[in-house]
């Protein structure tokens, strides 16, 4: 029990250190990674029929994707920013549906979309 608590504290400190040292490009990478992790955890909770936990994790994933939407710069990003905004909006709608229908395939769909966006973002060097 104590080992798990210590591990969680270590992970939290590690995440905080990464965030405090990160440039804006890296922060977006961390957000996307966090979103993918929450989606995987939500899938596990859904499979284990842990309904409250599933709802919390999907809510966190929605919050992260909402944060990614807010970070878009439509003036500098132009058409790409608009396309990403619509994609993020779609992802959020699918997550709401996944939460109400307990459909893991919807979580998988959003995970695949977010992973594709993250792969593109990771390909940009900063």
Swiss-Prot record:
Superkingdom: Bacteria
Gene Ontology cellular component terms for the protein in this record: cytosol
Listed InterPro entries: FliS (IPR003713), FliS_sf (IPR036584)
Cellular localisation: Cytoplasm, Cytosol
Keyword 4Fe-4S listed: no
Keyword Chaperone tagged: yes
Cited CDD domains: FliS
Bridged cysteine pairs (disulfide): none
SUPFAM superfamilies noted in UniProt: Flagellar export chaperone FliS (SSF101116)
Keyword annotations of the record: Bacterial flagellum biogenesis, Chaperone, Cytoplasm
Main location: cytoplasm
GO biological process: bacterial-type flagellum assembly; bacterial-type flagellum-dependent cell motility
Family: Belongs to the FliS family.
Matches recorded under NCBIfam families: fliS
Protein name in the entry: Flagellar secretion chaperone FliSB
Source organism per UniProt: Pseudomonas aeruginosa (strain ATCC 15692 / DSM 22644 / CIP 104116 / JCM 14847 / LMG 12228 / 1C / PRS 101 / PAO1)
Record gene name: fliS
């Amino acid at each position: 029990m104590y080992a798990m608590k210590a591990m969680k504290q270590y992970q939290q400190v590690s995440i905080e250190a990464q965030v405090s040292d990160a440039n804006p490009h890296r922060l977006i990478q961390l957000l996307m990674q966090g979103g993918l992790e929450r989606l995987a955890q939500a899938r596990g909770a859904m499979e284990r029929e842990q309904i409250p936990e599933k709802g919390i994790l999907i809510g966190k994933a929605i919050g992260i994707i909402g944060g990614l939407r807010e970070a878009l710069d439509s003036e500098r990003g132009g058409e790409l920013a608009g396309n990403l905004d619509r994609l993020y909006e779609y992802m959020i709608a699918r997550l709401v549906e996944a939460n109400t229908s307990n459909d893991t395939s919807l979580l998988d769909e959003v995970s695949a979309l977010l992973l594709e966006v993250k792969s593109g973002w990771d390909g940009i060097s900063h």
